């Protein structure tokens, strides 16, 4: 929805930007301000009090959302032999090695996550310039470089999300769909915030959660009170 459209302006008027909401209130308002016939994605944007240029202030992690994302992720796996068979059995959408690399080099990017066994990473490095900028490069810290590809596939299919602070100290992640009940959105939000807080760098000084906004892909940003770090489903 265009920010200049009548529907967007009407939705934005429902948001009191001077008064941050609780997570549950924000989830309810996000549902109300999503004016699209499609089931819009609900997203969270956080401004962190870190300097991502410094290695000791990088925030990167994963979390299993208790209610999933509302979308079944397409997963690509780099593996061979028994590991490849295990990935297929777990529901991976595409599995390969050199053949998959060639396909990606040719422009194939029809997947949302990439997993690799450790022995495949030297090969996967050949397409790092393709996967890296899209946030798809497998990494041990996010559990996507692992010998247990079956578990990794199951986790991602079940609603595991990855997040990483960008150069402007912002984090972005999905917490569900507008069709979710607000309680479920708030619980997903809480699970993600708990993990972000757990990963707070010791070198980060001052306020860590500086600004939080919840929105749908088609709706206005809704400010959330950063001080609410417990009891996420209370109004």
UniProtKB/Swiss-Prot annotation:
- Which GO cellular component terms, listed alphabetically, does the Swiss-Prot or TrEMBL entry include? large ribosomal subunit
Mind listing the UniProt keywords for this protein, alphabetically? Repressor, Ribonucleoprotein, Ribosomal protein, RNA-binding, rRNA-binding, Translation regulation, tRNA-binding
Q: Which Pfam families match?
A: Ribosomal_L1
Work out whether the entry's keyword set contains Ribosomal protein. Answer: yes
Identify the stretch(es) annotated as Disordered.
1-22
Q: Name the GO terms of the biological process aspect.
A: regulation of translation; translation
Tell me the superkingdom of the source.
Bacteria
Q: Does the keyword rRNA-binding apply?
A: yes
Provide the GO MF annotations for this entry. rRNA binding; structural constituent of ribosome; tRNA binding
Subunit: Part of the 50S ribosomal subunit.
Return the HAMAP family for the record: Ribosomal_uL1_B (MF_01318_B)
UniProt lists the family membership as follows: Belongs to the universal ribosomal protein uL1 family.
What does it do? Answer: Binds directly to 23S rRNA. The L1 stalk is quite mobile in the ribosome, and is involved in E site tRNA release.
Name of the protein: Large ribosomal subunit protein uL1
Lineage from the top down?
A: Bacteria, Bacillati, Actinomycetota, Actinomycetes, Mycobacteriales
């Amino acid at each position: 929805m265009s920010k200049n459209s009548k529907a967007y302006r009407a939705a934005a008027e429902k948001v009191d930007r001077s008064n941050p909401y609780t997570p549950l209130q924000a989830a309810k308002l996000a549902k109300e301000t999503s004016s699209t016939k499609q089931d819009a994605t609900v997203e969270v944007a956080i401004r962190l009090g870190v300097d991502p240029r410094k290695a000791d202030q990088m925030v990167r992690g994963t979390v299993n959302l208790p209610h999933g994302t509302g979308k079944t992720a397409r997963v690509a796996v780099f593996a061979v032999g028994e590991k490849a068979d295990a990935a297929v059995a777990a529901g991976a959408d595409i599995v390969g090695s050199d053949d998959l690399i060639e396909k990606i080099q040719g422009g194939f990017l029809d997947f949302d996550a990439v997993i690799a066994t450790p022995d495949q990473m030297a090969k996967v490095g050949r397409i790092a310039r393709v996967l890296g900028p899209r946030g798809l490069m497998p990494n041990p810290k996010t559990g996507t470089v692992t010998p247990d590809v079956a578990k990794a596939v199951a986790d991602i299919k079940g609603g595991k999300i990855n997040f990483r602070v960008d150069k402007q100290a912002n984090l972005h992640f999905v917490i569900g769909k507008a069709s979710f009940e607000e309680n479920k959105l708030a619980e997903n939000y809480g699970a993600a915030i708990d993990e972000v807080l757990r990963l707070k760098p010791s070198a980060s000084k001052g306020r860590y959660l500086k600004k939080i906004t919840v929105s749908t892909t088609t709706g206005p940003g809704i400010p959330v009170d950063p001080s609410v770090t417990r009891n996420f489903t209370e109004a």
